[in-house]
């Protein structure tokens, strides 16, 4: 799964995307081809150097017999993009702290139950949780893993 921070820049090498011819401004965000090359580092790194410099190591924030909550990307500094991973073993209620976020099911299947509906979930399902949704219940069939992305200070969900 690739999750892109809204502040990230994307330079496109291809001249066509979904049958549409892209202008140079669309491909290089208006900075031009030559300046785009300056955005990249051409210094070679070993696998260990690359891992130490750029890989985020998950940190266990909370764990009990029902669920494990890991910080994948903390969302620091304040109000920046954050990612957590939730691994469910049993039925668990979570509180969303009045903030919208998205969820992606990465492993397992089950149900998500809110005050007004119940939805079956499978790997690859993307979910939008609006800020007005105070609480939801995750009911896994076996083990279920979900990535949650949000922009509020971590932790932006609470395990109940």
Locate the predicted segments by residue.
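Short beta-strand His + acidic residue motifs that chelate non-heme Fe in jelly-roll/DSBH
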Residues: 1-4, 10-11, 94-95, 112-114, ...
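Conserved hydrophobic/aromatic beta-strand scaffold that supports enzyme active sites
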Residues: 2, 58, 83-85, 102, ...
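Glycine- and acidic-residue-biased ligand/ion/polar-headgroup-sensing regions
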Residues: 87-116, 123
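Residues that cap or initiate secondary-structure elements
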Residues: 92, 109, 118, 135, ...
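Active/binding-pocket-proximal capping segment
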Residues: 104, 127-129, 144, 152-153
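Short acidic-glycine-tyrosine-enriched beta hairpin
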Residues: 114-135
């Amino acid at each position: 799964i690739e999750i892109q921070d809204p502040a990230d820049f994307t330079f496109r090498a291809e001249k066509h995307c979904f049958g549409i011819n892209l202008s140079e401004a669309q491909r290089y965000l208006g900075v031009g081809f030559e300046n785009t090359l300056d955005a990249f580092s051409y210094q070679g790194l070993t696998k260990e150097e690359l891992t130490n410099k750029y890989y985020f190591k998950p940190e266990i924030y909370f764990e009990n017999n029902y669920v494990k909550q890991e910080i994948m990307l903390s969302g620091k500094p304040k109000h920046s993009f954050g990612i957590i991973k939730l691994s469910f073993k049993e039925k668990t209620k979570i509180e969303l702290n009045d903030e919208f976020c998205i969820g992606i099911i990465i492993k397992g299947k089950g149900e998500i139950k809110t005050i007004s509906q119940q939805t079956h979930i499978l790997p690859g399902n993307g979910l939008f949780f609006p800020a007005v949704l105070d609480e939801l219940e995750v009911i896994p069939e076996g083990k279920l893993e979900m990535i949650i992305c949000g922009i509020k200070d971590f932790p932006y969900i609470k395990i109940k």
